[in-house]
Amino acid sequence: MARRRLGLALVAALALLSPGAIAAEGVVAPSFWDPGRKPEKPDLAAIKQIRFLTEDDFPPFDFALPDGSIAGFNVDLARAICEELEFSSCTIQRRRWDLIVPALEDGSGDAAIASLKITDAAREKLDFTAPYYTTPGRFAVRKDSVLAAATPAALEERTIAVQADSAHEAFLKTFFPKSKLATFPTAQAARTALKEGRAHALFGDAIALSFWLNGQDAGDCCMFRDGPFADPGYFGDGVGIAVKKSNIALRRALDYALARVAQKGVYAELYLKYFPIGPY
């Protein structure tokens, strides 16, 4: 997923919202784990510590607070994992984005919970847990739109704003061949085109769109239309926690903890806290 910088003021406000209040608005947390499968606790004897690595400028996943500490969905999830594994030696350290993978490789960090996408290229260097979120594509339209659906038939001969040379553009070319594509150099420019009425619909990253729709930049102009498109051939296999290739014990421990955190409802609480307009 492209690294989009969303408004910190919005994220800080989200952090103060209660999960119950958000859930009441109908947002449903996704599930990436089989609720009927009881995870088997692995042997944790070989794991002496977990040094989580993340960044601090990719809200709502990780961001710096005024007091210098870090917060966000990734940060809270790391804390929940530490609590589930009952590790006293468990830290969350910030790194610049381009230094996170090198830190795993040189052993100065143990696990990267920094929105790293699971790709074939990444798997050559790192091991990943099962995905803890995905990055599907989704359509948005203006609130005064007459479009009742976001289907190839409904969008035939309609203009769709999309970022140029992106997976989203490639997807549209394949599955919406009769639509008119208005391409833009950035996702922000494509969003502005929809807001200003220069396109009938917008197609882009669902997570980024969810925060744009809820933020000041959108000006309450727009809304999602229909559900997400999660074709892994275009949008990847999701995002996981990365560990050094040889650290099998830690990967198994993290997978176990993620499944347990999900079963206990903690994952859903965190999701509802940070995603007031569900991207899925």
Regions found by a protein language model. Name each.
Residues 1-9:
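Bacterial N-terminal signal peptides that target proteins for export
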Residues 9-18:
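Bacterial N-terminal signal peptides
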Residues 24-115, 124:
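Extracytoplasmic small-molecule ligand-binding "clamshell" domains
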Residues 56, 133-141, 210, 214-258, ...:
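Periplasmic-binding protein-like
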Residues 56-59, 68-84, 117, 138-191, ...:
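Bilobed "Venus flytrap"/periplasmic-binding protein-like clamshell domains
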Residues 75, 79, 83, 90-154, ...:
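Acidic, polar ligand-binding/catalytic clefts
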Residues 87-89, 105-114, 195-208, 217-219:
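Alpha-to-beta junction loops
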